[in-house]
């Protein structure tokens, strides 16, 4: 029987890692993710998890150590956040380019400067071009489940790409919620033993990994990484379906909420989806035709799902905790690209919110709604990007 | 003396015509031999057999290795891979190896 208990998302991530039975874990402590490797080291020390726990001197070394272990042919795990993930940046490309199905938990935290330990998604959003699959969890149960799903998708022969699972700093990492720990046997059946066909070391089969590719070969290697990420779309759907069958919890790349007759739909990710759905309930009672959508998968970008969602809305608003300085929020930019060749598109708005841990309140969502309604009334968008919840008195 | 890499070069050249693998893994060991690094050379080791005492130091120190020994134990320089680092000339106790500017 699955155990129903209460825990923080960091603990849920550690439990997910334990259930997946990685052979090597390397990690370096960083707020708000420290508890993940701390808990795992406890599992290893207690003999509950048979794995090598490598203590390293930086996040760059942590990811490098798991790249080495994964290239040797075992299942691996690590966790980090913010500056730590930024320090891993160059090695993230290497993990993807070497097609190593590493899984990493991210306690989504802002980037310096100014230094700030609280939640936004800038750390992992900024890794969107590295070739890592990206999942975002709404709650602690999703943090656990999505890590198991990350292994399932990453290790699929059609994919073979690393995957990261993001969950919001403090809002989830340090908040205790009810979580169901699945049975080990069911997880074992779901994931199976990790048996790499390409990336493993065996003296009887000498190979070179991490090769040099001249201009005559580099593009093809990169194309295969891009192509694998394209193929991941279908594999993710299959994995979600199998997960639901085995564990009874349903996941979708984009989960819609009260969208069927909605004129205005807001899209978000992570824990903000909970706030948004609550707010939609309230606005529905007040007579507004609003809906919500939660993006669980950010890479590969859910192009088809965004197109289907766009068909339902007259105004599509993105509420995101990240900003691509020099343009708009990354989710809005990507969604715009997904819709660019559609003959009919909704009016589109981008709302930058909650950076550096600022609470996203109903009042701020009301502001976004007012801007969306104004666009709907006028039939055009004058300004696509709005920062909501800004303290104008400080500017 | 024939390059000991001849068979590797032939196998690796065959691999080059095969498909790109996931992770750009090279499945044939020794495939780096098809990259003729001798073209990087600025100075070339010139061998003076009359001074050579067959101590093998050049053969031992060559980091490539681009020096192998003929049947009599004299060094043979593989200019396909010798990058002209000059370590052999530096180590040679009888100055039997002289670095001369490469002329192309």
UniProtKB/Swiss-Prot annotation, chain A:
EC number per UniProt: 1.2.7.1
Does this entry carry the keyword Oxidoreductase? Answer: yes
Q: From the UniProt record, which GO molecular function terms apply?
A: pyruvate synthase activity
The alphabetized UniProt keywords are: Oxidoreductase
Gene Ontology annotations of biological process type: response to oxidative stress
Please list the reactions this protein catalyses.
Answer: 2 oxidized [2Fe-2S]-[ferredoxin] + pyruvate + CoA = 2 reduced [2Fe-2S]-[ferredoxin] + acetyl-CoA + CO2 + H(+)
Q: Which InterPro entries match?
A: PFOR_II, Pyruvate:ferred/Flavod_OxRd, Pyruvate_synthase_PorA, Pyrv_Fd/Flavodoxin_OxRdtase_N, THDP-binding, Transketo_C/PFOR_II
Source superkingdom: Archaea
Gene3D superfamilies linked? 3.40.50.920, 3.40.50.970
How it assembles, according to the record, is: Heterotetramer of one alpha, one beta, one delta and one gamma chain.
This chain's protein is named: Pyruvate synthase subunit PorA
The organism's taxonomy opens as:
Archaea, Methanobacteriati, Methanobacteriota, Thermococci, Thermococcales
């Amino acid at each position: 029987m699955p155990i129903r208990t209460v825990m923080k998302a960091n603990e849920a991530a550690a439990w997910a890692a334990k259930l997946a039975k990685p052979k090597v874990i390397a990690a370096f402590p960083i707020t708000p993710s420290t508890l993940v490797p701390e808990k795992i080291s406890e599992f290893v020390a207690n003999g509950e998890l048979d794995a090598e726990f490598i203590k390293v001197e930086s996040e760059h070394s942590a990811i490098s150590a798991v790249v080495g272990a994964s290239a040797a042919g075992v299942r691996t795990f690590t966790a980090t956040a913010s500056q730590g993930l930024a320090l891993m940046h160059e090695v993230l490309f290497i993990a993807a380019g070497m097609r190593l199905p590493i899984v990493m938990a991210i306690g989504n935290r802002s980037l310096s400067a100014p230094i700030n330990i609280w939640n936004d998604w800038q750390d992992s959003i900024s890794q969107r071009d590295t070739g890592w699959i990206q999942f975002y969890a709404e709650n602690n149960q999703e943090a656990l489940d999505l890590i198991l799903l990350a292994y399932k998708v990453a290790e699929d022969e059609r994919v073979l790409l690393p995957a990261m699972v993001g969950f919001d700093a403090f809002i989830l990492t340090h908040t205790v919620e009810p979580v169901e720990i699945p049975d080990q046997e069911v997880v074992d059946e779901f994931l199976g033993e990790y048996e790499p066909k390409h990336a493993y070391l065996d003296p009887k089969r000498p190979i070179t990994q991490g090769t040099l590719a001249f201009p005559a070969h580099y593009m093809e290697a990169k194309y295969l990484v891009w192509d694998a990420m394209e193929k991941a779309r279908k594999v993710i759907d299959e994995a979600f379906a199998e997960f639901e069958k085995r564990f009874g919890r349903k996941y979708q790349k984009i989960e819609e909420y009260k969208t069927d007759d909605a004129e205005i739909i807001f899209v978000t990710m992570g824990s903000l989806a909970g706030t948004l759905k609550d707010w939609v309930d309230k606005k529905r009672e007040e007579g507004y035709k609003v809906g919500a959508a939660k993006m669980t998968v950010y890479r590969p970008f859910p192009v088809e799902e965004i197109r289907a969602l766009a068909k339902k809305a007259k105004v599509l608003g993105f509420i995101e905790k990240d900003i691509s300085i020099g343009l708009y929020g990354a989710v809005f930019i990507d969604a715009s690209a997904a819709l660019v060749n559609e003959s009919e598109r909704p009016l589109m708005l981008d709302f930058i919110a909650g950076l550096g841990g600022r609470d996203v309140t109903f009042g701020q969502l009301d502001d976004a709604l007012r801007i969306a309604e104004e666009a709907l009334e006028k039939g055009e968008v004058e300004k696509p990007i709005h920062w909501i919840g800004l303290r104008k008195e400080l500017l | 003396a024939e390059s000991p890499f001849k068979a590797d070069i032939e196998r690796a050249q065959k691999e080059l015509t095969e498909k790109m693998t996931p992770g750009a893994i090279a499945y044939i060991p020794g495939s780096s031999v098809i990259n003729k690094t001798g073209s990087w050379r600025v100075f070339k080791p010139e061998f003076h057999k009359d001074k050579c005492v067959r101590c093998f130091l050049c053969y031992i120190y060559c980091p490539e290795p681009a020096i192998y020994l003929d049947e009599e134990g004299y060094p043979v320089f593989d200019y396909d891979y010798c990058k002209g680092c000059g370590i052999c000339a530096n180590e040679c106790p009888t100055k039997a190896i002289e670095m001369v500017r490469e002329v192309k």
